[in-house]
Amino acid sequence: MTDGLKIDSRPLPAFYCCYLLRSKNRKAFYIGSTPNPARRLGQHNGSSKGGAKRTSMQGKRPWEMTCIVTGFPSRFAALQFEWAWQNTHATRHIERDVREARKDELEKGRKNASPVKRSRPPMSLEARLKNLHHLLGVGSFSRWPLHVRFFAPDVFSQWEKHISKMNTSLRKSITIRLTPAELPKLAPDVSSEMRTHFIPEVIRAIPVAYEDIKPYVEKSMSTLRDGKTRDCGVCKKDVNVDRSLVLICPNETCCSVSHMSCLSQRFLAEEANKEAFIPIEGTCPSCHSPIKWSDMIKELSLRMRGEDELKTLFKTKRKKKQVDTTEDDTDEYPDIDDLNADLDEDLDETWMENVNEEDDKPRS
């Protein structure tokens, strides 16, 4: 590889999301971001250290994760979206008329607020969902590979009710889905602490350690190491993997390779958006299957920059010997609590000092 391609940085994160928590009494909400929703929910509910101070206030636990927004290309991108979602009265990502309405609410709230009260206007759940819908459609975030996943059916129903009234719809590449978080059927004598610390399996099962693209990475590395001469699927010229940024079709049965610049131009041409610089999706020049640009870029960054991450991903993790067995059980994937744990820092408690309780009265 040439010196120009030696990039001393980490690959794109395996996973990063923004989330909306709701407290047990359903009068308080929290917006945050994390690379590991299951671990973060445990922090908020006190099963591990690192949760924001505000979320540990008396009477607020247990917290439930009602929905997440996924697809952020970096931690800083998620923090940017998180701040905008928390501060719709101040962010420039929201249209001026919407922002001014939020400011009016803020000024009304300040008149009766004590000096120690927080500076954000009170918001209902409906308002938070409206703000989320606004953010998903603004130019700043409209080309990010974002998706929304709901865990609380009643929150999803309120979202559906809201978008049914909207004149504009989100772009088709944004998927909105409901995967209900089933609460356990615990016996009456189960301690309240156990109930508080419960993390739904649907949240635990979210892939946060590159395990979802492991087969794709294996296929790409095998394709590039087979010694065969390959031509770019777009320009048809020879592909030099040591000097070029090369993208591989993620389709299991397709071995198409392309220069990143060539495939980018092809995808943008298919989209016919002259103002766009980064594609969202397109079709493989060989198998013609639809491909998400973000999937290929994540695989490329992991393959080129993730030496340590790849070692962890492909290393067989040993467990302790079980009783009456002669062999060790193994775990195919790395411990998600170890991978990228340094990215999941304690939340900034000053943010929560400026968050209000829910206002049950919907605001126009």
UniProtKB/Swiss-Prot annotation:
Keywords: DNA damage, DNA recombination, DNA repair, Endonuclease, Hydrolase, Metal-binding, Nuclease, Nucleus, Zinc, Zinc-finger. Residues 14-95 form the GIY-YIG domain. One of its GO terms (biological process) is double-strand break repair via homologous recombination. Its EC number is 3.1.-.-. Residues 34-59, 101-121, 318-364 are annotated as: Disordered. It is found in: Nucleus. Residues 325-364 have a biased composition (Acidic residues). A zinc finger (SLX1-type) spans 232-287. Catalytic subunit of the slx1-slx4 structure-specific endonuclease that resolves DNA secondary structures generated during DNA repair and recombination. Has endonuclease activity towards branched DNA substrates, introducing single-strand cuts in duplex DNA close to junctions with ss-DNA. This is Structure-specific endonuclease subunit slx1. It comes from Pyrenophora tritici-repentis (strain Pt-1C-BFP) (Wheat tan spot fungus). The gene is slx1.
